[in-house]
């Protein structure tokens, strides 16, 4: 064995001494000179052997415990995996909480020249439709926000629809009842017009009856007058016939008496002429002589009559006259006769006037009934027109109320739409503020 320092082939004395000492100790141990060391070495060997056995047992026990711990760990890990899979199936949001845009917004840098901010990518949901709206893959953030706003608007629309259903039902019932109200008003107007027409027909019938009565009365009067005239003509013809039969017997007697009467008339005429001629002269002389006497007598008579009238009065004059009772009775007879004639004339006039008044009353009632019938028909027609106009006015009133309610609903919808739009804008503003705060927190 050579030295590593000098490189010579001579042996090292120190190493040779150590080797010699070691060999000597080994020889002493074999020969029994150093018994203490041998005893100690035997005890140490036994202790080492016992410790080695204990170490082997402990190692085997530890390996068994490790296996049991490994199996229990495997079971617990399997239970945790099944529990995690159940939670992921029951709630997508909990399973994908670590994959949201906020979690992916901030990531560590992948290289020296790469920033630590990446655009977020939203997870793909399991369902492809939400309330009938199809979700597409690869949609951007703004598109998804618009979709969210659309879904919010649809939800608000459903709530508005639920709140407006009662109002719409009331409006529909009002619209349906408007024609019924109009028809009821028309029926009422038609009934009133029918009643007016019935009254008009009654008046018309009354007028026709009065006209017929007037015609019958006039015809009866004409018939009675014609009948009286016919009876008078018959009596006149009967008297003529009787007179003709009597004249046939007295014709000869009349002829003989006529000739004798002519002769007597001629004789008496001649005699009267002579007598008149003789008496004419005497009458003239007598008239001239008695003229003065008559004038004086007349004056005296007038004076006496005036005195008697002044003294006795009308009754005295009547009583002083001769035959005054005959004159009075004659005057009373004249008064009675003339009064009877006047009364008869007045009765005839009154009867005629009453008959004429009855006829005129019948005639006027007939004319009035006819005119009332015509007027009633016109009134019924106008009542129908008035009922139709009133029905149309009521229908228009109902429809105006409906239009007012619909306008109110439109105003409410507009207000709620503006509120929803403002809410969506506020949501976008909050999202933008959140992104700004996240970016500022990243770079600061």
Swiss-Prot record:
Q: What are the Basic and acidic residues biased-composition ranges?
A: 77-86
Give me the stretches of Low complexity compositional bias.
15-24, 88-103
Please name the source species: Chlamydia pneumoniae
Compositionally biased intervals (Polar residues):
1-13, 25-42, 113-124
List every stretch annotated Disordered. Answer: 1-124
This one is known as: Protein CPn_0808/CP_1063/CPj0808/CpB0837
Q: Name a Pfam family for this protein.
A: SseC
What is the similarity comment for this entry? Answer: Belongs to the chlamydial CPn_0808/CT_579/TC_0868 family.
């Amino acid at each position: 064995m050579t030295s590593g320092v000098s490189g010579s082939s001579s042996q090292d004395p120190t190493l040779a001494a150590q080797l010699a000492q070691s060999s000597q100790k080994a020889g002493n141990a074999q020969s029994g000179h150093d018994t203490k060391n041998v005893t100690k070495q035997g005890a140490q060997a036994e202790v080492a052997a016992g410790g080695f056995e204990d170490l082997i047992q402990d190692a085997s026990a530890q390996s068994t415990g490790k296996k049991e711990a490994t199996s229990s760990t495997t079971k617990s890990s399997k239970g945790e995996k099944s529990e995690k899979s159940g939670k992921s199936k029951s709630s997508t949001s909990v399973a994908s909480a670590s994959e949201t845009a906020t979690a992916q917004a901030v990531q560590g840098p992948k290289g020296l020249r790469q920033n630590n901010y990446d655009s977020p990518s939203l997870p793909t949901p399991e369902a492809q439709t939400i309330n009938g709206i199809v979700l597409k893959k690869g949609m951007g953030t703004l598109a998804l926000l618009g979709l969210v706003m659309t879904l919010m608007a649809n939800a608000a629309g459903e709530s508005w629809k639920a709140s407006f259903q009662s109002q719409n039902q009331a409006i529909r019932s009002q619209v349906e009842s408007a024609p019924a109200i109009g028809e009821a008003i028309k029926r009422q107007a038609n009934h009133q017009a029918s009643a007016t027409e019935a009254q008009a027909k009654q008046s018309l019938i009354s007028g026709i009856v009065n006209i017929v009565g007037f015609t019958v009365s006039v015809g009866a009067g004409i018939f009675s007058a014609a009948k009286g005239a016919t009876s008078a003509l018959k009596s006149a013809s009967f008297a003529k016939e009787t007179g003709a039969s009597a004249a046939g017997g007295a014709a000869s007697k009349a002829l003989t008496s006529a000739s004798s009467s002519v002769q007597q008339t001629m004789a008496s005429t001649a005699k009267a002429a002579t007598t008149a001629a003789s008496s004419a002269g005497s009458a003239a002389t007598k008239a001239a002589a008695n003229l003065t006497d008559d004038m004086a007598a007349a004056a005296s008579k007038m004076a006496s009559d005036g005195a008697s009238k002044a003294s006795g009065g009308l009754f005295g004059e009547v009583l002083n006259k001769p035959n005054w009772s005959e004159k009075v009775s004659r005057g009373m007879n004249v008064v009675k006769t003339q009064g009877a004639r006047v009364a008869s004339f007045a009765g005839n006039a009154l009867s005629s006037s009453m008959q004429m008044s009855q006829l005129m009353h019948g005639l006027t009632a007939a004319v009035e009934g006819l005119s009332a019938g015509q007027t009633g028909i016109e009134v019924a027609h106008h009542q129908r027109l008035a009922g139709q106009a009133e029905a149309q006015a009521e229908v228009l009133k109902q429809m105006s109320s409906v239009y007012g309610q619909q306008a109110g609903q439109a105003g409410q919808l507009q207000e709620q739409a503006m509120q929803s739009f403002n809410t969506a804008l506020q949501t976008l503003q909050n999202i933008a503020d959140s992104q700004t705060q996240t970016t500022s927190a990243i770079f600061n």
